[in-house]
Amino acid sequence: MSGTYKTHRSRRSHAGAVRFDTKIAVLVRDDLEPWQRLNVTAFVVSGIAGAHPQLLGEPYEDADGTAYLPLLGQPVVVLEADADTLKAAHARALGRELPMGVYTREMFSTGHDEANRTVVRAVGRDDLDLVGLAVFGPKNGVDKTVKGARLHP
């Protein structure tokens, strides 16, 4: 899949909420500690934002004029899944050619980006010990990719 996806606002519902044609979904393993779930979520979503800067909204500013960084301009759904469901979602994302960020168990033992890439590169895609992933693409494709996962509590 090329990097040409853009977030399109498809329509407004009667309540005024914006609906999107694209979706960002994060899956985290259901056996992780809370701090690990948060860490994985932050890392994999940063990959989506880095690869697709058009997803970022405008910078924020408070009433005092203090500037803040832009955030993703569309919602992110965070889901949990067991190891088998996560592995299946990974395979479906690859099959659909959806942009994806991954986090493996080995990455918890590293201390920087180069080491993270090294531990991922050392394992074939079918043998990755995935503990999380983020996927972005057309809403229906993402929904089919994360089938079987549950909303994170």
Model-derived segments and spans:
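Positively charged, small/polar-rich N-terminal and surface patches that mediate targeting and assembly
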Residues: 2-153
